[in-house]
């Protein structure tokens, strides 16, 4: 999620562990945000009373630490800007630390052939679109388990699905647009397994507002007995993000199969895994600078570093650019145009800030003059001082003049001619401080383009402030 500016005036005083008196309308709103969030999702019980400065301070601090640990934030017990940012994101209404229990018994269905019924429909989508979204969401889970799901049109089903607003008499009222999007109950009789969607939201079948398929797939995980996951790449992560291709992560698959076992398919599906930024084996698909920051890309994720923040930000590419595909293969910044270009296959996209420019994607043949034998770009970097962009394809490099908008004569060359010592394959590259940083596998080479010498050999994730690397 794009970072907010640093909150210079924290809600916590230096020596205080409770809420201070709010000194502005914004602070008062933030105090209320923290209070409601901890009550709803971390079992903070204020009994409807105003949270006092000292009496409940220790409990509030502990609940905040619990929340920060769950989301992988700095564990301070203080509502800093990063913590408030997470609290303000739209999310599932099921608590993170306490089970959403209304029915006694085990958190699983004894019967593997389940029924569902859509009691009513949102006006935001056609009935056919709603039916398709719900069916696809159940199919994600049936693909990896012995479970089957059959739609019924009347009577009581195992999983009842409804679109409701506000207080809908289940002790878990919705809160209007944004915030709490939906919730579902663990398996069981009565309301057990049922899923409720807030009809004050705008439900869609694309990346805008809230994608029904994405939210339904998450809620049905609860209907089947899963709790929230701390893995940001998991479908069962509590905060909402539309990642383009909705899929179960390996964490989701492991969780649901621990309850019901694997599917009966001869070939078991394998889900994507979330990168561990301090994994010494970490490799990258693409890297680029963007407005002074460095962004690393892996599968459907980006990792973002900023000299003002010690932590690495990890999230879906779609958080910044929902129109870009996953699995980007190359990227580079044209700083004087405030533009970044992303490549996948023979297509590329130009972005400015968080906006994909109109008319993209385009193909690399007409725009850059590559021959049709080039099917994709491995890596790219633009040299700020000269306006020359280097493209790396297999063991060759091409040089493109950004001012003339044409390839330079004499190219392609073997990589070793212009960049001796870095090997015959480049996975990713970027320029910073006048140096090129080349990546291949787990290795990183700091290269001086003036002397054409390697200065330092590093591990690929050396930019991430890992204690052990």
UniProtKB/Swiss-Prot annotation:
Can be activated without removal of the activation peptide. The modification Phosphotyrosine is found at residue 360. Binds 4 Ca(2+) ions per subunit. The keyword Nucleus does not apply. Disulfide bonds join 278-466. It is found in: Secreted, Extracellular space, Extracellular matrix. InterPro entries: Hemopexin-like_dom, Hemopexin-like_dom_sf, Hemopexin-like_repeat, Hemopexin_CS, M10A_MMP, MetalloPept_cat_dom_sf, Pept_M10_metallopeptidase, Pept_M10A. Keywords: Calcium, Collagen degradation, Disulfide bond, Extracellular matrix, Glycoprotein, Hydrolase, Metal-binding, Metalloprotease, Phosphoprotein, Protease, Repeat, Secreted, Signal, Zinc, Zymogen. Tyrosine phosphorylated in platelets by PKDCC/VLK. It catalyses: Cleavage of the triple helix of collagen at about three-quarters of the length of the molecule from the N-terminus, at 775-Gly-|-Ile-776 in the alpha1(I) chain. Cleaves synthetic substrates and alpha-macroglobulins at bonds where P1' is a hydrophobic residue. A motif (Cysteine switch) lies at residues 90-97. Residues 1-18 form the signal peptide. One of its GO terms (biological process) is proteolysis. Ca(2+) 1 binds at residues 124, 199. Ca(2+) 4 binds at residues 285, 329, 378, 427. The keyword Amino-acid biosynthesis does not apply. The modification Phosphothreonine is found at residue 274. Hemopexin repeats lie at residues 275-324, 325-371, 374-422, 423-466. GO terms for molecular function: metalloendopeptidase activity; peptidase activity; zinc ion binding. Ca(2+) 3 binds at residues 175-176, 178, 180, 198, 201. This is Interstitial collagenase. It comes from Bos taurus. The gene is MMP1.
